Amino acid sequence: MTIETRYNVPAGYKRVAVENGSFADFLRKQKLKPYGEKALYYNGQAKRSEGVYDSVINVEIGDRDLHQCADAIMLIRAEYFYQKKEYDKINFNFVSGFNAQYSKWIQGYRINPNGKGSYYKKTSPSNTYKDFRSFMNIVFGYAGTLSMEKEMKPQSLENMKIGDVFIMGGSPGHAVIIVDMAENDKGEKIFMLAQSYMPAQQTQILINPADRNMGVWYSLKGKTVLETPEWRFPLEKLRKF
């Protein structure tokens, strides 16, 4: 099942329209693990779900402590462009400021992350899914909430849309991504959030801890902060790609 097929919207709300093939459409159609299955840490252990998450996105995270909060968002964004074959759009800044480009990686270049970072030619051109995930692993290691927040642009709550991110850069920082949204006749929005966290773990659909009656849906009506199960975000921390 997907986010869209597993979760109904509350009475009085309708899912916002999205363009077929858009990033919003891609997020809404993320495949979920069978209901009740736990999110797994990179070491194979299960994460407790009670009060934290309701479903788990079926994502392979490997056996290293890499796929944390910002990494999950960078991966899902990169996966979107990878399946569209828009490889030149798969690039991320390291904390150092170095821009890691998948278009260079598939030409056989590799990255020396020391100092300000540099490319060096190592192998023949190749563009397999394994190549893509190897590239993303080095991104996970040298990019994070600090660099991602700087790369993104401020977004107003009025213009909030699927694919936007609440992010606080830091060590540690945190980030959650809006993966679905609905609104009522008054134009009031509700939305669904996904996250990974520390240590590396599969991406989860979060429960609303402030209003259990809402299940996995969040509303900012009357709120001054966004309260999620494992982090509180000032509302001005909303960003867009």
At which residue positions do the language-model features occur?
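Bimodal feature
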Residues: 50, 64, 176-178
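Extracellular-facing segments of soluble proteins and assemblies that are Gly/Ser/Thr-biased and enriched
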Residues: 58, 63-153
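Cationic-aromatic interfacial patches
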Residues: 1-60, 67
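Residue-level marker of positions within ordered structural domains that often coincide
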Residues: 78, 183, 198
